[in-house]
Amino acid sequence: MKTLVVKCFLLLALVCSCRAADSIWQLCNTNSNISASSQVSKNIDSLLATLVSKTPSKGFKTTTSSSYNNKEKVYGLAQCRGDISNTDCSTCIQDAAKKIREVCQNQSDSRILYDFCFLRYSQENFIGKLDTGAGLIYFNVANVTEIDPKKFDNELGALFDKIRSEAVLPKNKGLGKGKTKLTPFVTLNGLVQCTRDLSELDCAQCFATAVGSFMTTCHNKKGCRVLYSSCYVRYEFYPFYFPLDPAKTGPSVGRISSVHLSP
């Protein structure tokens, strides 16, 4: 698949109680000559039913679906963000399964990302393989003014070194989160997560690739999200992971523009 990076210039919402029905990104491999046959389509529906029913209990599921002779096999993965409830996970996966069939019609290589979950299926076996070939970057258009830029870089780097090292530990299931005070009145919040099919090494490599955008596309910005099929990293100047502090959230405001880049 051709590498595709999407960079969205976004004045981010001040609150993260995002509805699961609002997808962030979907990728349908329309460049591929592989389209879903009738049997593959049935296998996809069967696979999605399994992901919808099985993912919420543990927040993660991989599965396959094939016909009686093991031809036209489809591989699938679903994962919820590690800080959300089983109920929110279930809602998100249901929405993802429904929408991916609407936006990626007749495609046998598709993925969809929400703030709370990620779902993917393909006829190629992608399970356990690092994938940073396609991604999405969101960042706040406002620059950091509350702290010296060099100090901010150092604090941001230290926070993500900490939460990345936590996320790769098997007991944490790919999730790391934390915060640090930049000033008495400003707190930097960060979260990372990789898909739980990855090895510790591949998870760390995905994080390194994603966090690299903090010093380029997102440099000195007040918020940034870098999203790949294999991992997710984010920082904000407001609480966005659960449990939220309602006293520190605010209304959603913003302007969105985007540019698609390809090699």
From Swiss-Prot:
Its main location: secreted. Residues 22-126, 132-240 form the Gnk2-homologous domain. It comes from Arabidopsis thaliana (Mouse-ear cress). The gene is CRRSP55. Residues 1-20 form the signal peptide. InterPro entries: CRR_secretory_protein, GNK2, GNK2_sf. This is Cysteine-rich repeat secretory protein 55. CDD domains: Gnk2-like. Belongs to the cysteine-rich repeat secretory protein family. It is found in: Secreted. GO terms for cellular component: extracellular region; secretory vesicle. Keywords: Repeat, Secreted, Signal.
